[in-house]
Amino acid sequence: MQNWRDETLKDNVSVDKSFDFAVRIVNLCKFLNNEKKEYILSKQLLRSGTSIGANVSEAQRAQSKADFSSKMAIALKEANETYYWLKLLHKTDYLNESQYNSINADVNDLIGLLTAICKTTNSNK
């Protein structure tokens, strides 16, 4: 049985992409913990990487345009922070080139999408 909320958010690119990205982040953090025995940076990555989708999802039920804009801006900040942690994990050899390139492409895609949403929202004020 599908939830009314799922039906309302159907075909929302930002919701879908940020959720799928959060799943990738959770799986990456499991890998970093289990295979690389890395716990500190991965905890930061888990927090920021899953926060993107949480804020995008929250924005869908914003009480006002200002609330929507604020939540999307927070999601963008979290995406930028996630980019930082991924780059650091790559430069410190916790992520190989292939792993980094794949997930980095996804975070850059999200950053571009969220930037466009924030610009559009701010220009319509």
Map each language-model feature to its residues.
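Short, C-terminally biased terminal segments at protein or domain edges
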Residues: 1-54, 58, 62-125
